[in-house]
A protein has these predicted regions:
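Acidic, proline/glycine-enriched N-terminal capping motif
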Residues: 1-53
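Acidic, low-complexity central loop/insert segments
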Residues: 2-3, 9-10, 52-136, 240
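Short glycine-/aliphatic-rich beta-strand segments at the starts of folded cytosolic domains
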Residues: 4-25, 91-102, 178-189
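A generic structural signal for short beta-strands and their flanking turns/coil linkers
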Residues: 7-9, 39, 52, 61, ...
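Short, conserved charged micro-motifs
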Residues: 17-22, 72-76, 113-117, 192-197, ...
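Short, intrinsically disordered, mixed-charge
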Residues: 23, 27-31, 71-73, 77-85, ...
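Glycine-rich, small/acidic residue-mixed loop/short-helix segments
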Residues: 49, 151-157, 165-167, 171-253
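Anionic-ligand-binding alpha/beta catalytic cores of soluble enzymes and soluble regulatory domains
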Residues: 111-187
Length: 253
């Protein structure tokens, strides 16, 4: 399905320092991007927390950055704050844009490209695919309280990349292997609505996590995203949410 992304913030980044600037600011290894390729990542705080989730594509002599509309102004402000002495220019891009999703596995691989998309972001079918892919919505599934390695962004972290803002705490936790929580998929019995923040319980840990997003799956169950403590995040395990049994799923599923 072609999902409309016309509301997303998009910037064309040019200038002689464009690659070095983005390499030192984002988690994305832009130096490794071939022309036409793209990568997902984040801009982090110095303490390693996720300030904004972004996609960067290399197109000729420019980089194209895309992010959700809700964090577009914040993202540009972060770029401009760090671009003090750098030869970089940020140009807003407007007009129709879309992203093509075929299945949960394809979601994170799909670039944001020009052209109208026929399916709105709010469509239930889009939401089901989004949740099964672990494609996060900023402010719901990830915010400044989270580290990238707790989220599906972990699959894109390049630990051979050089220094960038927030890199040290990310690398330290990776070396120690002691992340306390992670985002997981959940299949919940029943299709009654689940609220954001609903508590996840387990016999071994009463406060095992909380729900961030949920939608009726259309088959009598509910599918959801939620952060689970490492003691209960094993795939195939069961937890309880509002008195309902839920099975833990790997992302994507």
């Amino acid at each position: 399905m072609n999902i409309d992304r016309s509301s997303w913030g998009r910037l064309r980044i040019t200038g002689g320092d464009r690659e070095r600037f983005l390499q030192g600011l984002t988690t994305i290894n832009v130096q490794s991007l071939a022309d036409g390729a793209h990568g997902w990542g984040a801009i982090l705080s110095p303490k390693g927390r996720v300030l904004t989730v972004i996609d960067i594509a290399k197109i000729g002599d420019a980089f194209l950055l895309a992010c959700e509309a809700s964090i577009a102004d914040k993202t540009r402000a972060l770029l401009e704050r760090y671009a003090v002495m750098d030869d970089v220019t940020f140009e807003s891009i407007t007009g129709p844009a879309h992203q093509t999703w075929e299945d949960p596995v394809s979601v994170w691989r799909a670039p944001i490209v020009e052209g109208a998309g026929g399916v709105p972001e709010t469509d239930d079918a889009v939401e089901r695919l989004r949740i099964r892919a672990g494609f996060m919505r900023y402010g719901a599934d990830v915010d400044e309280d989270h580290f990238p390695f707790e989220t599906p962004l972990a699959q894109f972290l390049d630990y051979s990349k050089g220094c960038y803002v927030g890199q040290e705490p990310v690398f330290r936790v990776h070396a120690q292997g002691n992340a306390a929580r992670a985002l997981r998929g959940l299949v919940v019995e029943g299709d009654a609505p689940l609220a954001k923040g609903a508590q996840i319980k387990h016999a071994a840990k009463d406060k095992a996590g909380e729900i961030t997003s949920a939608v009726a799956a259309g088959d009598g169950t509910t599918i959801a995203l939620g952060y689970l403590h490492r003691t209960v995040w094993d795939v195939g395990g069961t937890v309880e949410i509002d008195g309902r049994k839920a099975t833990v799923r790997e992302l994507p599923w």
